[in-house]
Amino acid sequence: MDKTATLATWIGATLVACIGMAPALAADQAAPAGNDARWTAYQAQMSRDQQEHPTLALGADAPGFALPGTDGKLHALADYKASPVLAIVFISNHCPASQLYEGRIKALVHDYAARGVTLVAIAPNGPEAASPHELNYTDVDDSLEGMKQRAAFRQFPFDYLYDGETQAVAHQYGPKVTPHIFIFDSQRKLRYEGRIDDHLREARATHHEARDALDALLAGRPVPVAHTPVFGCSTKWMSHAASAREELQAWQAQPVTLEAASFDALARLRSNPDHKTLLVNFWATWCAPCVHEYPQLLQTYLWYRSRDLDFVSVSVDDPSQRASVEKFLATAHSAIRNLQVDTDDVYGVMAAFDKAWDSGVPFTMVIAPDGHVIFKHAGEVDVLALRRLLLANLPDAGPFAGNAEYWRD
């Protein structure tokens, strides 16, 4: 049995969180077959979240904050007192819905900054509260370091603040999902909260409630619509951390096996007979760059394994070193298909897999379902670049269809 399949039951029960349904919307989904108990527990958790973290009431004062930003500075509510209108939007790195709105958030800054509006983004999630499979649409996690990488990658023109350490600010504002926007007037009274517009795909949005609210406040008029539903990824409160640990522990409990691989087996591997996106990494225990990058490659697979991605590791250690290879793989919890070449003829290994491979290890290749090479690299890979390439090429369907384009942009 495929080792990943042994996790299917567990993953099915938490798939809604993975694709990021808001708690109120998640309750409308059908329970995954055979997972009634876990589904009931999930619904109960979402209900508790809404009760324990109510959304700030319209007309309420903006709660104060002092949070670190991706620029290395501390930012407080009072820093924005000169702005006649303040928009605070809760976003997250990992959420595909939030990613799809990044361009629209940047456009709000571009279109309204000259009119005195300040927009601030806050990341509310506890990094340890997101399960590995919930990171299946992202290159980075929800940590402050991940935020810095995302802000630089997407050139955010706004302050991006981190609340994941204590979630004290998120507790006061009560964002149900990311993205969730709150707009305050000159007296810092909440005049609008909800969605930015009415469709994940920008071209299909017909109602732009956040812009309507900004225009009304700048003109001194009442906001036409003060509240809307929100759709996105549920806020990852630290109370979810136990569930995230459970998934990681389930992965780490999987058996780690090692197969001998002949030249013919390597040639079959290169043909990608399973017709999924295939990540292949050739490595050795004596290779420092291999050992350094391997945990990051494995983590990448752990995040994306629900999206038709396979990962195969191939050790080029001498066959006599099988025990050392097994020890390394077991320590790394490498519960994937692990191969070790059955020969000391490394040039034969290279020719059997890729006749154009003309250097040593590490050697990494990404093969498309139809067998063509998407990426290959001799030497240690840039893991962020590799993740972005995978995200641009993995199947792109469902509620977040169009997300691959975000990574190709």
Can you say where each PLM-predicted feature lies in the sequence?
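Short, internal strand/loop/helix patches
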Residues: 140-178, 182-183, 190-191, 328-361
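Thiol-/selenol-based redox modules, centered on thioredoxin-like
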Residues: 185-258, 361-409
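Bacterial N-terminal signal peptides
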Residues: 10-22
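Short pre-active-site segment immediately N-terminal to redox-active cysteine/selenocysteine motifs
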Residues: 84-86, 91-94, 276-278, 283-286, ...
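Thiol-based oxidoreductase modules, predominantly thioredoxin-like and allied folds used
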Residues: 116-141, 156-166, 308-322, 334-346
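N-proximal helix/coil linker or "cap" segments that precede and/or mark the start of modular domains
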Residues: 28-64, 206, 217, 222-264, ...
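Conserved redox-active cysteine motifs that mediate thiol-disulfide chemistry
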Residues: 92-104, 282-299
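A short beta-strand-turn-helix
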Residues: 65-86, 257-278, 298-304, 350
